[in-house]
């Protein structure tokens, strides 16, 4: 999802997963199941630099080998570039909710075909046309240093022998 003060990653305002199937996103958001939304906005507060990457891969294990394979070439080609961490933040917030701050917003997805198809919209109050939208915690803040330290610590843990085949 991409909400106010954020931008999309597939169109100027739509996030890929919602844009691909906004109808499914809308059904899910309106389903009443407990949801904490981790939008692009919070992920764009991450800043995976070459220095952080080098710290991650100091220890050899299957996870760091995968990181070397997937990110190593990117940092070799563009060492000055940084990368956002998306799914990793969503998962980390399940492990330690204090890594993120949230704001309660009503969230809906535009399903009208046009230039704003698949765009998620959030507001503190319900608005005309969004009847049925649910209020949910939406992640806005990220303690980047605590997050990346936890991430590095976790990926450097030894894996059980059964998973090292």
Identify the function of each model-found stretch:
Residues 16-23, 30, 35-165:
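Conformational coupling and interaction surfaces
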Residues 1-13:
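Class I SAM-dependent methyltransferase SAM-binding "motif I" and its flanking Rossmann-like core
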